[in-house]
Each structure stands twice: as structure tokens, then as C-alpha cells.
Swiss-Prot record:
Disulfide bonds join C304-C328. This is Mesothelin. The gene is Msln. Keywords: Cell adhesion, Cell membrane, Cleavage on pair of basic residues, Disulfide bond, Glycoprotein, Golgi apparatus, GPI-anchor, Lipoprotein, Membrane, Phosphoprotein, Secreted, Signal. It comes from Mus musculus. PANTHER family: MESOTHELIN, STEREOCILIN RELATED.
Length: 625
């Protein structure tokens, strides 16, 4: 029952008792809460509508309206209104979610003064295109604000975050992989994303900064941190000279230390530090579960009792206490008699101690002579252990793959094959069959150069989800293999097969594909390589998607559709009639210097991305509308 229907009933009874009785009736039927919700919602919509229609003072709006802001509501605002709303968010110190900030950023004017920039929420600036601030002074001011923002609003290794880091380094004048303390301060949270090559060449500056980073380091960063700390050529000195204060200063970097570094730290220092952090475990959080056992084992090591040192692996070891196994058993003896280790029914805890002894004996990885004899002991090694190995025998690989079958050891099996390929081995059909129960996502774990050893026939088995974690280089190589595998297939059947691999297709290949009426779905479109996609015109994308072109609207604020929109002229997008926004406004000229930023091993310069500039004097000559 709607409220207008209720009013005459209330009005027809002059008695307060009658009114109260009617309200009780409504309450018992559950109508009052609905009426309240409807009234509140209508009131909020009216307030927001009033603001959109001319209420200049956004700061007077209730905080709840900001927190519930949707992209649809933002899209109805003018650029000036969006700017006022964003400034009110900063003024009221409201924390919006990432998608809300992105929507607001897209509706802001293309030209912002320093004063306007200063008045915007810091986290919102993360979603602005750095190309909006050309010139040293403008970019320096922009990135001085970015350095104070919470960069973790953007996912690690996301395209937006990578672009911000590239442009920040370029603005700072950093070329190559050397950064100064001033550079790191200017980068702020973005410095946590600097690749391992920067860590290796700027360890004095970066190590203290990385120690305070919230997110986990990537593989290249961890490797570089370990190498520079192991060398002793840092402000912390060699691990053998470290103190409790040194370990405190390392903070989260303690979690990346390997066995060889931990063993070099004085035992009394480790014991004291363990007591120190046990009083306040929150300082290291979840990292404590990784660090504590590693340090405790080494700190509490005792001497072997007289007469207890074994000279062979036998059943007597079953009755040793764990600390006696730690103190008395020799790793080289275990390696020589691995067949006996597998035969005797040792407990899981005892086998873990044996593994620790082997790891200490071979800190750089097990020799192949031991790997060949591992047998069932292979179940106790980790993928990280295997990455250190050098395996050249295909028989060894096949034997260990049989051991791992049905043991939930996919990661170890993949690491083993990758290790074998890295040593120059070839992936034959027997190995592919042995890996048959493992999702083909393992292709992404192989190094790009090792993919050449993968038979083309495997491409017939690959599904879209198998390539989700592949790098761009992986996708490019797998795409070429897929083209070879499907060369005798044509028409729509070819498209159905090749679309899984289109993330590695070049812009030339995509242009050719657009001529065949494939009607690509939006899910496949989103997996296309950004560098290839942005090279396509509006007309080419329209041909590529066919009737699915309408789905662009739902993805316009997400990569890669957003990146493609940034490179198109707004007038061309308007012709689609989909209401797509974010294109290049009339009066702007796109200069693409086509110089790639290089965080790869082959390049040392950071090149500029595309830049939008306005040149009034050239407009008549260039006939820009």
C-alpha cells in the first residue's frame, strides 16, 4: 500500500487512538520499514538531483550520498560539477572505492590548474592520465601529489600503475636503472614497484624503502635483495656482522632471506631477535610464520651427544629425538644413501629434518646425482628448491613425474619440467602425457625461450583460462605456435581455435582478422594485447566486434577498452552512438614517439608514451576542429 492511499484513512479519524492503531497495523504488516526505505531513497535521489541541477555547495551534501556514488550518476554530471564533487570529497575527507574514483576522474576537465589539482583527493589523481601534465613543471607538481597518494588503490603490476611509474621516472629524469634518494622520495609508493635491476644498482637507497613496502616483492626484486644482502656491500654490512637492530631495520625484507643468509647471521643475534619479535608479533604479521621456523632452527641448534653420530642410514635413526637428528645427521651421508631414506618408515617430521640437512649441505641446489636418486623423497621438495636444480636427464624427469602423479604436486612437476627445459632438454610426448592431469597453465611457468621446445600439437588442448597468467612475451610465442598448429583450419573454425591465443596477436593480424566478419565477443576483445589494440581505428574495431560493439559501453572504464578509447578521436567514437567517453577531444594533437619504456633486459632508456598537446597556432594549418 502506498503512502498517499494511507493518508485519507488517517485523516478521517480524529482520534489519536485510531491513528496509533493504524500505525500499529502498518507496522505488523511490515509496511512501515518499506515506506521508510522508499522515503529515504526518494529523499536521497531528490537531494542528489538538486545538487546536479545547480546546488553549487557539494560539501553540504550528506556523506552517505558520496559513499553510494555510482558511475551512472557521475556520467550525468558536467565536467565542472564532477570537479566540484571531487573537491568536496577531499574537503570532507571521504574515502571512495577505486571504481568510484576512476569514474570521477574520467569526468574531470582536461585542463586543471595547480590549485584545482591540489584540491582533488590524492587517490583520485592515480586515475588521471599523466599525459595531461606535459612539461617539467606540470609533471613535477602532479607527481609530487602522487607520491603522497595510496598507490595500493591500484593493483600491483596493473597497467595504470606501471604507466604512472614510467612517467614518474621520466619526469624525474631517470634514465637507466640508477635512482637517487631524491628520486625515491619523489616516487613515493611507486618506488615499491621498481624492478630488481634498480635494486641491484641502487641498493643503498632502495633497501630501506623496500623494507617498509606493504605488498609482497616480486620475484626479480626478491632475487636482487638477496644478492645484495649476501654480498655484504650494503649499509647493513655482511650478514655475519648483523645485530638485532640490523634485523629490525630490515623489517619485511627478513622474509626474503634464504637459508645461506640466515645461517651466516650469528646464532645469539637470531635467538635474541626471535625473543624480541615474539613480544610483538604484529610487527611482521603473516610474514612471521615464514621467518620464525627458519630462524629458530638455526638459533637453537645443539651439539651432537658423544657416540650418537651415525655412519649409515638405518632403523636406529627412527628412535632419535628431532634435535639429535638435527645435530648428528650428516647431509652428505643422506645424499649417498637416499635409497635407504626412502625404504625406512621415517615420520614426516624426521623427513623434514633430513631435507633441512640436505638443503644446508647443498645451498645452491641439489646435484643431479642426488636428484636422480630422490624417488619418493621428491614429494618433500618445494618448487623453489627445484628452480635451483640443473636437470639434463629426461629419464630423471619422467621418473620423478611418476612419483608426483596423484600427489597434488602440480607446482613441483611444472618446476621440474621447466628446469629440464632450461638446461636444453626437449619436451617429448611422454612428458606431455605425464603432465596430462595438470592444467595447461604450466605453459606460462616456462621461460619464453623454453616454449620453443613445446610441440605445436599441445596448442589444440589449450583453453582461454590456461593463459591468464602468461606474460606478453609468452602470449606472442604461443600465438605463433597456434598459427602453425591451426594452419590447415579455415573460416569460423579457425577463429574459434585461434581466439584463445589472440592476446599475442599483432595489430597487423587483428586488422586482417577484422575483414572476416568474426563477431568477436567482448571477453576475447578484453584479452587482446593493449599495444596492438590501441593501433586499431574505430572502424576496424567495429568490424572486429560486429554486433558485439555495444558491449564496449559496459567496459569503457576498464582496461584495455579504456586504453583504446584514450587513443581515439572523440568525434569518431560519437559516430558509434554508444555514448562512449574518454576519447581525444577536438583540438588535440597526438604525438606518438613510438619509443618503448624498457624494464626489460635489452633496453636502458625510458621512452615517452603518447602525449596530448594543444597548439593553437597550428590548428588552422592542421585543420583540426
Amino acid at each position: 500500500m502506498a503512502l498517499p492511499t494511507a493518508r485519507p484513512l488517517l485523516g478521517s479519524c480524529g482520534s489519536p487512538i485510531c491513528s496509533r492503531s493504524f500505525l500499529l497495523l502498518l507496522l505488523s504488516l511490515g509496511w512501515i520499514p518499506r515506506l521508510q526505505t522508499q522515503t529515504t531513497k526518494t529523499s536521497q535521489e531528490a537531494t542528489l538531483l538538486h545538487a546536479v541541477n545547480g546546488a553549487a555547495d557539494f560539501a553540504s551534501l550528506p556523506t552517505g550520498l558520496f559513499l553510494g556514488l555510482t558511475c551512472e550518476e557521475v556520467s550525468d554530471l558536467s565536467m565542472e560539477q564532477a570537479k566540484g564533487l571531487a573537491m568536496a570529497v577531499r574537503q570532507k575527507n571521504i574515502t571512495l572505492r577505486g571504481h568510484q574514483l576512476r569514474c570521477l576522474a574520467r569526468r574531470l576537465p582536461r585542463h586543471l590548474t595547480d590549485e584545482e589539482l591540489n584540491a582533488l583527493p590524492l587517490d583520485l589523481l592515480l586515475f588521471l592520465n599523466p599525459a595531461m601534465f606535459p612539461g617539467q613543471q606540470a609533471c613535477a607538481h602532479f607527481f609530487s601529489l602522487i607520491s603522497k597518494a595510496n598507490v595500493d588503490v591500484l593493483p600491483r603490476r596493473s597497467l595504470e600503475r606501471q604507466r604512472l611509474l614510467m612517467e614518474a621516472l621520466k619526469c624525474q629524469g631517470v634514465y637507466g636503472f640508477q635512482v637517487s634518494e631524491a628520486d625515491v622520495r619523489a616516487l613515493g609508493g611507486l618506488a615499491c614497484d621498481l624492478p630488481g635491476k634498480f635494486v641491484a644498482r641502487s641498493s643503498e637507497v632502495l633497501l630501506p624503502w623496500l623494507a617498509g613496502c606493504q605488498g609482497p616483492l616480486d620475484q626479480s626484486q626478491e632475487k636482487a635483495v638477496r644478492e645484495v644482502l649476501r654480498s655484504g656491500r650494503t649499509q647493513y654490512g655482511p650478514p655475519s656482522k648483523w645485530s638485532v637492530s640490523t634485523l629490525d631495520a630490515l623489517q619485511s625484507l627478513v622474509a626474503v632471506l634464504d637459508e645461506s643468509i640466515v645461517q651466516s647471521i650469528p646464532k645469539d643475534v637470531k635467538a635474541e631477535w626471535l625473543q624480541h619479535i615474539s613480544r610483538d608479533p604484529s610487527r611482521l604479521g603473516s610474514k612471521l610464520t615464514v621467518i620464525h621456523p627458519r630462524f629458530r632452527r638455526d638459533a637453537e641448534q645443539k651439539a651432537c651427544p658423544p657416540g650418537k653420530e651415525p655412519y649409515k642410514v638405518d632403523e636406529d635413526l627412527i628412535f632419535y629425538q628431532n634435535w639429535e637428528l638435527e645435530a648428528c645427521v650428516d647431509g652428505t651421508m643422506l645424499a649417498r644413501q637416499m635409497d635407504l631414506v626412502n625404504e625406512i618408515p621415517f615420520t614426516y617430521e624426521q623427513l623434514s629434518i633430513f631435507k633441512h640437512k640436505l638443503d644446508k649441505t647443498y645451498p645452491q641446489g641439489y646435484p643431479e646425482s642426488l636428484i636422480q636418486q630422490l624417488g619418493h623423497f621428491f614429494r618433500y621438495v618445494s618448487p623453489e628448491d627445484i628452480h635451483q636444480w640443473n636437470v639434463t636427464s629426461p629419464d630423471t624427469v619422467k621418473t620423478l613425474l611418476k612419483v608426483s602423479k596423484g600427489q597434488k604436486m602440480n607446482a613441483q612437476a611444472i618446476a621440474l619440467v621447466a628446469c629440464y627445459l632450461r638446461g636444453g632438454g626437449q619436451l617429448d610426448e611422454d612428458m606431455v602425457k605425464a603432465l596430462g592431469d595438470i592444467p595447461l597453465s604450466y605453459l606460462c611457468d616456462f621461460s619464453p625461450q623454453d616454449l620453443h621446445s613445446v610441440p605445436s600439437s599441445v596448442m589444440w588442448l589449450v583453453g582461454p583460462q590456461d593463459l591468464d597468467k602468461c606474460s606478453q612475451r609468452h602470449l606472442g610465442l604461443l600465438y605463433q605456435k597456434a598459427c602453425s598448429a591451426f594452419q590447415n583450419v579455415s573460416g569460423l573454425e579457425y577463429f574459434e581455435k585461434i581466439k584463445t591465443f589472440l592476446g599475442g596477436a599483432s595489430v597487423k593480424d587483428l586488422r586482417a582478422l577484422s575483414q572476416h566478419n568474426v563477431s568477436m565477443d567482448i571477453a576475447t576483445f578484453k584479452r587482446l594485447q593493449v599495444d596492438s589494440l590501441v593501433g586499431l581505428s574505430v572502424a576496424e574495431v567495429q568490424k572486429l566486434l560486429g554486433p558485439n560493439i555495444v558491449d564496449l559501453k559496459t567496459e569503457e572504464d576498464k582496461s584495455p577498452v579504456r586504453d583504446w578509447l584514450f587513443r581515439q578521436h572523440q568525434k569518431d567514437l560519437d559516430r558509434l552512438g554508444l555514448g562512449l567517453q574518454g576519447g581525444i577531444p577536438n583540438g588535440y594533437l597526438v604525438l606518438d614517439f613510438n619509443v618503448r619504456e624498457a624494464f626489460s633486459s635489452r633496453a636502458s632508456l625510458l621512452g615517452p608514451g603518447f602525449v596530448l598537446i594543444w597548439i593553437p597556432a597550428l590548428l588552422p594549418a592542421l585543420r583540426l576542429s
